[in-house]
């Protein structure tokens, strides 16, 4: 699904490149430093989602010339994170800790003792617990140093390429960059990328030896779970919104424009949907999907394929049942717009209702659609 969204984004960029009007609008967007910072972060999360969407099953053995694959499927993100993706503890632990958060009971010399248990992947390389502070400081300093060096290299190369493309000297380009005289504030992108690089190097220096953000109740690494949740959040948010918009826009505008029995019918429909408890509906739908998966075990061989199907159907269900709020807002705005003079003039000139809704109503409710879509 993430790959499909990425392909759709690519086609949209090609469409923007061919349209002067869209290019002018996007030039206005990228002239803001805050917009470019947000765009850089979105690209980073999209990259994480794409890397986490490429799944494969490694070959564990070869018998009679046939490859035997592992039952468990992995993603490129799992392989990139390496040890962090497989390290599991028993329960909670603090960030960068070397022992569990809670004491456990064990026997020493035949006597019961309650003490903290050492973590499997948290400071296991340390010879003594007293070396923890020094080790963390050294690894953090090395990570920060590497991050700052890479950030400086990024700034140097980027400024050099920009100055060469514009025919200016390096010093002049640096002066222009810091005085913010360019139409596109490249310093916003470079600053955001530098922060990500420094944080990445810092985490990369500590993560092979510690749980950077600790572990949860079941002993899983919290930072690893956060990285893995990016793809889920992107798929659910984007797919549910894309599923919601057609129903909400069409039905909401039609209810406000036609009024009468059309309005009553659409109101009855979304009032009925709103009365159904969403949690129970989602739970029932997931159970139905699970029954389908159990009835067709050959179609989904691995656990990750079954999880992806459940995630996809869950997003569709949320989208199909979550359009009522936006439809109400669009209905109310359309009721107001339909009484304005330019709508009456369009009717007087013989323009059909659907053309009026497309040309005159929809452009005036786009702001509501954008706000609700972003908040959802």
Give residue ranges: language-model regions.
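Gly/Trp-centered helix-boundary motif
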Residues: 1-244
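Alpha-helical transmembrane segments of integral membrane proteins
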Residues: 34, 158-159, 189-199, 215-376
């Amino acid at each position: 699904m993430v790959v499909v969204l990425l392909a759709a984004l690519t086609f949209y960029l090609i469409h923007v490149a061919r349209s002067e009007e869209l290019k002018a609008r996007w030039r206005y967007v990228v002239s803001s430093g805050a917009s470019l910072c947000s765009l850089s972060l979105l690209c980073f999360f999209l990259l994480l989602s794409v890397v986490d969407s490429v799944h494969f099953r490694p070959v564990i053995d070869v018998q009679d010339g046939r490859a035997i694959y592992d039952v468990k499927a992995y993603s490129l993100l799992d392989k990139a994170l390496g040890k962090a993706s497989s390290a599991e503890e028993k329960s909670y632990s603090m960030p960068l800790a070397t022992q569990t958060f809670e004491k456990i009971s064990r026997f020493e010399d035949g006597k019961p003792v309650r003490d903290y248990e050492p973590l499997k992947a948290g400071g296991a390389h340390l010879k003594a617990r007293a070396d923890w502070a020094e080790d963390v400081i050294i690894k953090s300093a090395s990570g920060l140093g590497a991050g700052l060096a890479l950030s400086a290299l990024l700034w140097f190369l980027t400024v050099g390429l920009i100055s060469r493309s514009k025919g200016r000297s390096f010093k002049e380009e640096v002066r222009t960059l810091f005085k913010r005289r360019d139409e596109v504030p490249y310093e916003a992108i470079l600053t955001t990328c530098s922060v990500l690089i420094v944080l990445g190097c810092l985490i990369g220096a500590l993560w092979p030896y510690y749980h950077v953000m600790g572990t949860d109740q079941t002993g899983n690494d919290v930072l690893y779970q956060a990285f893995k949740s990016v793809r889920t959040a992107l798929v659910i948010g984007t797919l549910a919104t894309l599923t919601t918009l057609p129903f909400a826009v069409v039905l909401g505008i039609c209810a406000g424009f036609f009024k009468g029995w059309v309005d009553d019918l659409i109101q009855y429909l979304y009032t009925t949907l709103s009365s159904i408890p969403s949690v129970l509906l989602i739970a029932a739908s997931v159970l139905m999907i699970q029954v389908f998966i159990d009835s067709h075990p050959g179609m989904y061989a691995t656990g990750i394929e079954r999880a992806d199907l459940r995630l996809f159907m869950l997003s569709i269900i949320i989208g199909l049942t979550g359009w009522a709020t936006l439809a109400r807002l669009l209905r109310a705005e359309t009721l107001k717009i339909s009484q304005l003079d330019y709508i009456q003039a369009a009717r007087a000139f013989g323009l059909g209702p659907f053309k009026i809704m497309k040309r005159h109503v929809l452009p005036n409710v786009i702001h509501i659609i954008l706000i609700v879509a972003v908040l959802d």
